[in-house]
């Protein structure tokens, strides 16, 4: 039995934390004293996953598809993630799974995990989603509460690909 080809993607994003901005992860607003500075809503988790998915499909990166233009100013990154899934599907790919890690010490993120994962499962059209949170242990700009970062890895499957023998 032959299986469809599978491809791995890796994504990473980081943003400074500043006053006057919201902190959003996978469309979930986090109650925090500082928010993520970015052209869109600054959702580092969605951005890292977008880059992982585009990487798996050899389709460039988030800036290729969603440049820093007026069209994407303050954009909802969960919507951009849904659009990325459509871009992959149009090219014959489907998301198998995503595993991500968010690094931040500004606020405890684990109480938000269930809603974050729920949003990602819906956006990615897969039940195979895992999100982990790390504090940075007082190291780096995440540990010093000056920033937030996210790492993501994904597996996508190319559907209906025929192999010649």
UniProtKB/Swiss-Prot annotation:
Residues that, per the record, bind a divalent metal cation: 13, 15, 47
CDD domains hit by this protein: MECDP_synthase
Binding site for 4-CDP-2-C-methyl-D-erythritol 2-phosphate: 13-15, 39-40, 61-63, 141
Annotated InterPro entries: MECDP_synthase, MECDP_synthase_CS, MECDP_synthase_sf
One BP annotation, GO: isopentenyl diphosphate biosynthetic process, methylerythritol 4-phosphate pathway
Catalysis: reaction(s): 4-CDP-2-C-methyl-D-erythritol 2-phosphate = 2-C-methyl-D-erythritol 2,4-cyclic diphosphate + CMP
Signal peptide residue numbers: none
Cofactor note: Binds 1 divalent metal cation per subunit.
Site (Transition state stabilizer): 39, 135
Cofactor(s) listed in the protein's UniProt record: a divalent metal cation
EC number in record: 4.6.1.12
Gene3D superfamilies linked to this entry: 2-C-methyl-D-erythritol 2,4-cyclodiphosphate synthase (3.30.1330.50)
Keywords associated with the record: Isoprene biosynthesis, Lyase, Metal-binding
UniProt pathway annotation: Isoprenoid biosynthesis; isopentenyl diphosphate biosynthesis via DXP pathway; isopentenyl diphosphate from 1-deoxy-D-xylulose 5-phosphate: step 4/6
GO molecular function, one term: metal ion binding
Broadest EC class assigned to this enzyme: lyase
Stated family: Belongs to the IspF family.
Assembly description: Homotrimer.
Functional description taken from the UniProt entry: Involved in the biosynthesis of isopentenyl diphosphate (IPP) and dimethylallyl diphosphate (DMAPP), two major building blocks of isoprenoid compounds. Catalyzes the conversion of 4-diphosphocytidyl-2-C-methyl-D-erythritol 2-phosphate (CDP-ME2P) to 2-C-methyl-D-erythritol 2,4-cyclodiphosphate (ME-CPP) with a corresponding release of cytidine 5-monophosphate (CMP).
Full protein name: 2-C-methyl-D-erythritol 2,4-cyclodiphosphate synthase
Gene giving rise to this polypeptide: ispF
């Amino acid at each position: 039995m032959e299986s469809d080809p599978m491809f791995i993607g890796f994504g990473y994003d980081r943003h400074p934390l500043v006053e006057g901005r919201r902190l959003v992860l996978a469309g979930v607003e986090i109650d925090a004293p500082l928010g993520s500075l970015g052209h869109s809503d600054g959702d580092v988790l969605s951005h890292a996953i977008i880059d992982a998915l585009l990487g798996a499909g050899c389709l460039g990166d988030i800036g290729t598809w969603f440049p820093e233009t007026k069209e994407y100013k303050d954009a909802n990154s969960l919507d951009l993630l849904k659009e990325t899934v459509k871009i992959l599907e149009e090219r014959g790919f489907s998301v198998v799974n995503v595993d991500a890690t968010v690094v931040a010490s500004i606020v405890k993120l684990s109480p938000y995990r269930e809603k974050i994962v729920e949003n990602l499962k819906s956006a990615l059209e897969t039940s195979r989603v895992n999100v982990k949170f790390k504090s940075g242990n007082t190291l780096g700009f995440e540990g010093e509460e000056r920033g937030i970062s996210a790492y993501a890895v994904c597996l996508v499957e190319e559907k209906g690909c025929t192999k010649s023998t």
